[in-house]
Structures are given as C-alpha cells and as structure tokens.
A protein has these predicted regions:
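Conserved SAM/SAH cofactor-binding pocket of Class I
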Residues: 1-79
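Short glycine-rich, flexible loops that bind phosphorylated cofactors or substrates
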Residues: 21, 89-91
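Short strand-turn motif at the edge of the Rossmann-like AdoMet-binding core
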Residues: 44, 109-113
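Short amphipathic alpha-helical segments
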Residues: 53-54, 93-96, 119-121
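A conserved beta-strand element that flanks and buttresses the S-adenosyl-L-methionine
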Residues: 82
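Short glycine-/small-residue-rich Rossmann-like dinucleotide-binding loops
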Residues: 85-86
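A short glycine-rich, Lys/Arg-flanked "PGG" loop and its adjoining helix->strand segment in the class I
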Residues: 93-106
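Active-site capping/gating segments
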Residues: 113-165
Length: 165
C-alpha cells in the first residue's frame, strides 16, 4: 500500500479506521521513513477513537483522529485516501466524489468478491486506476484510483415532444 501513498502531499486520510488498519500502520511506516505527512483517521466510534488516540500517543505518530461521521463533512482536502473494510465500493466512490474537493488518489482494498464488485462499480463510474495483487491473500487486490467520474445514465424511455405555438 505504501507504494500508492502520495508522499508529496501533507495529509493521508483513512476512512473508517476502526482498529487502525491501515492508518496506524501507514503512520508508523511514514515515521520510520522520516516523512512529514499527517494521517487523518476518521472513526465515529468513541471507543475506537480513544484507542486510536492512545496508540498514536504511545507510538508518537503524526495522526489526527476525527471522531465524526465523514459523510457529514464537505470540501475535504487530502493527498491519498485509504479505504479498507469501511463501506461498499459504490458508497465510498460516491463519498469521495461528493465530499472531497481535493485528493490525489483513492487506495481501495478489495477482498475475495472484489472482482465482481469492481466490475459492477464500473457500470456507474469511469475510473482511472492501477490494480495490484495483495501480498497477503491471493484472492485480494488493491486499487489505486486516480480519477473518479460518474457515468451519465441514459434513459431508454426518453421521449421527445414537439410543441408548436
């Protein structure tokens, strides 16, 4: 995943961080690489947010924990966005498209049903992406999505009426 993280930005965002995967791990890797990026961890659960703050403090990680619903926020700005086991792909694509005004890329973790989910998502979205096989599971893969655009739906039943005045 670190190969896909935009190291030239100031912020990396982890959506629905949960117990810290991948946000805390990436923050730790960036600290060891001596990179000056801040990781924004979005987790609406109070208990998980407390855990993330404690881990970040003890490991002296450069993180900021947002205990709020990311869907309620608008005009977010970041470099890379990471999404692992957060919400279904179409919902995450819509969230990024609607709520982030600036971002470099979306790193999306796909599980064993990922191919089918991804193919279905491509019916509604135009995506510029690179796919990378998972190192830990042969059925999984990562997507590095650089551009997200909604496809325009064509209504088959559109009728044209001519009105004469």
């Amino acid at each position: 995943i670190i190969d896909f993280v935009d190291l030239n930005s100031n912020i990396v965002t982890d959506l629905g961080t949960g117990g810290g995967m991948p946000g805390i791990i990436i923050a730790f890797m960036l600290k060891n690489m001596k990179k000056n990026l801040k990781i924004h961890l979005y987790e609406k659960s109070h208990h998980k947010s407390v855990f993330l703050r404690e881990v970040s403090r003890k490991l002296k990680l450069k993180t900021e924990i947002f205990q709020e619903n990311v869907f309620d926020l608008k005009k977010l700005k970041t470099g890379s966005i990471m999404s692992r086991a957060f919400k279904p792909m179409p919902i995450v694509l819509d969230l990024v498209y609607e709520n982030f005004s600036i971002y470099k890329n979306l790193i999306f973790f796909m599980g064993k049903n990922g191919k089918k989910i991804f193919e279905n998502s491509l019916k509604e979205w135009d995506l510029e992406y690179v796919e990378k096989k998972s190192l830990t599971n042969e059925d999984s893969f990562l997507l590095n999505i650089k551009k997200i655009k909604k496809k325009i739906k064509k209504n088959k039943k559109t009728k044209c009426k001519l009105f004469l005045l």
